[in-house]
A protein has these predicted regions:
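A short, surface-exposed alpha-helical micro-motif characterized by mixed small hydrophobic
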Residues: 224-226
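Conserved ABC ATPase signature
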Residues: 158-162, 166
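H-loop/switch region of ABC-family ATPase nucleotide-binding domains
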Residues: 218-219
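Catalytic Walker B motif of ABC-type/P-loop ATPase nucleotide-binding domains
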Residues: 183-186
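Helix-to-loop junction immediately C-terminal to a conserved catalytic motif
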Residues: 64
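ABC ATPase NBD coupling module
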Residues: 30, 81-105, 135, 249-253
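A short, proline-enriched helix->beta-strand linker immediately N-terminal to the Walker B motif
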Residues: 177-181
Length: 282
């Protein structure tokens, strides 16, 4: 697994670097992402928040290599993964860039497990097929990962036999077994029932404690506050506010837009609490 201790030794150094990133679709009037710049240090958790349609998921997709960029650079440990070219719709990466990209893992909102493979088969496919690692060693590591997320007894199950929360935990194991230096999470609890959200968030908190470098897009503000080291508020494809002190962002944001955004979530939380109280009294 990823060497958390080594990451801590490099704390403060940029693991993932985003510089002046631009993403614009063909025939679009304006960029989806415009002049985005930030660094994610080794062993830190960087959280992206913002309203729907702000470009959060698109940003993660560009970092993961699923969307080409039209400006700026994406780098890992100082080596450029991708340089944007205006008007291009394909990335055209070098062999070295492709190798670096494999060090960035991603967990999606929709699980994306193969329905025709067991839990163990889903986790072991990429490391044996792509990384050419020994099948026996990979299976042993997969079982250890399943134990870590409380699913060792489901290794032979099929995806349709699992709950949404269990499938998402399998997806996290599938990403971890590739030993990513940086792990991206895109609204991984958005498709889950409320009762299943906690089990996934607990796994992510444990990963943060172990020193895994993470970039997280989430609408769970209480969770974001608990896990984030650094945070940005994204809106209309641009950074509205950035804080290297996440707690300060959540308690004392500097921009009016950030204050308004956080107040909305605070209102929603109180409203949900009131609704629950009313139901309990009936």
């Amino acid at each position: 697994m990823t060497d958390a201790a080594g990451k801590q030794d490099q704390a403060g150094q940029a693991s993932l670097g985003i510089a002046h990133l631009v993403k614009q679709y063909a025939n679009a009037d304006r960029p989806v992402l415009n002049d985005i710049s930030f660094d994610v240090p080794h062993g830190k958790v960087f959280v992206i928040v913002g309203p729907s349609g702000s470009g959060k998921s698109t940003l993660l997709r560009t970092i993961a290599g699923l969307e080409p960029i039209q400006g700026g650079t994406i780098s890992l440990n100082g080596e450029v993964i991708e340089t944007g070219k205006p008007g291009t719709e394909s990335a055209g990466r070098s062999k070295r860039s492709s190798e670096l990209r494999t060090r960035v893992g991603m967990v999606f909102q929709s699980y994306d497990l193969f329905p025709n493979k067991t839990v163990l088969g889903n986790i072991t496919l990429a490391p044996t097929l792509v990384q050419k690692r020994d099948k026996g060693e990979v299976e042993q590591e997969a079982i250890r990962l399943l134990e870590r997320v409380g699913l060792a007894d489901r290794k032979d199950s099929w995806p349709h036999e699992l709950s949404g929360g269990q499938r998402q935990r399998v997806a996290i194991c599938r990403a971890l077994i590739l030993h990513p230096e940086v792990l991206l999470f895109d609204e991984v609890t958005a498709a889950l029932d409320p009762e299943m959200v906690r089990e996934v968030l607990d796994v992510m908190l444990e990963l943060a404690d172990s020193g895994q470098t993470m970039l997280i897009v989430t609408h769970e503000m209480q969770f974001a506050r608990a896990i984030a080291d650094q945070v940005i508020l994204l809106e209309d494809g641009g950074i509205v506010e950035r804080s290297d002190d996440a707690e300060r962002f959540f308690t004392n944001p500097t921009t009016e837009r950030a204050k308004q955004f956080l107040h909305t979530f605070e209102f929603d939380r109180h409203r949900k609490s009131a609704d629950q109280s009313e139901r309990s009294e009936q």
